[in-house]
From Swiss-Prot:
It comes from Helicobacter hepaticus (strain ATCC 51449 / 3B1). GO terms for molecular function: nucleic acid binding. HAMAP family: UPF0102. The lineage of its organism: Bacteria, Pseudomonadati, Campylobacterota, Epsilonproteobacteria, Campylobacterales. It comes from the Bacteria. Belongs to the UPF0102 family. This is UPF0102 protein HH_1751. SUPFAM superfamilies: Restriction endonuclease-like (SSF52980).
């Protein structure tokens, strides 16, 4: 299985998890010239921009580097501008390891 297919499977799994947690999925794989946002979801009137990372033999969170956060932040700014979003938002990470999901909210504050 190639990495693109694994990524799509992880995002599908993440969407199921997020819906079960009360999120409404607004968009998937939003592409901007600055980068890609895996999932954009809404919960409690807050827009969540979610980066999905998965892995079995390592800690997937370590793939979210300062450079990646910078690219995501630019893509989020572009999305907010083009969609005229003025409500609260945050950048989250959804980590999938060994079939378990962990949502880490506001990763830019870590």
């Amino acid at each position: 299985m190639n990495s693109r297919h694994k990524g799509t499977q992880a995002e599908d799994f993440a969407c199921v998890f997020l819906r079960e947690c009360g999120f409404e999925i607004l968009e998937r794989n939003f592409f901007a010239r600055y980068g890609e946002i895996d999932i954009i979801a809404l919960k409690d009137n807050v827009v969540h921009f979610i980066e999905v990372k998965s892995g079995e033999s390592f800690e997937p969170i370590y793939n979210i580097t300062p450079s990646k956060i910078k690219k995501l932040t630019k893509a989020i700014g572009f999305y907010l501008f083009t969609h005229k979003i003025t409500q609260a938002y945050c950048l989250d990470a959804l980590i999938i390891k060994n079939g378990e999901c962990e949502l880490i909210e506001n990763i830019t504050l870590c």
